[in-house]
């Protein structure tokens, strides 16, 4: 199934935020977990704030301070669907 760029962009941002919450909190760890290109990982991290998600960056190690406009419980319940849409492991 083909998904819109809007949907995949949104899912990618919340998935990376979820990964950070799970301890996959550096660009190399995100790349290893997802196989996404480095630039995609960096661009995703740079765009997460557009969802009002508050990340702290401490020398390349990220931490979620606030999920903002995103319901973290919904993400936790639907993480397998999110990964399937993005075709990530």
Predicted regions and their residues:
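Long, low-complexity, charge-rich intrinsically disordered regions
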Residues: 1-5, 19, 66-89
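Short, leucine-enriched amphipathic alpha-helices that occur as contiguous helical runs
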Residues: 9-16
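Short capping segments at the starts of secondary-structure elements
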Residues: 21-26
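The alpha-helix within a helix-turn-helix
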Residues: 30-32
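Residue-level detection of the helix-turn-helix DNA-binding "recognition helix"
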Residues: 45-50
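Minor-groove-contacting beta-hairpin "wing" of winged helix-turn-helix DNA-binding domains
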Residues: 59-67
């Amino acid at each position: 199934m083909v998904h819109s760029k809007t949907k995949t962009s949104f899912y990618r941002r919340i998935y990376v935020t979820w990964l950070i919450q799970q301890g996959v909190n550096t660009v190399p760890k995100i790349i290893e977990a997802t196989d996404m290109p480095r630039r995609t990982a960096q661009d995703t991290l740079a765009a997460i704030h557009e969802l009002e998600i508050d990340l702290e960056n401490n020398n390349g190690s990220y931490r979620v301070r606030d999920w903002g406009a995103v319901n973290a419980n919904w993400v936790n319940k639907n993480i397998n669907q999110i990964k399937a849409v993005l075709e990530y492991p």
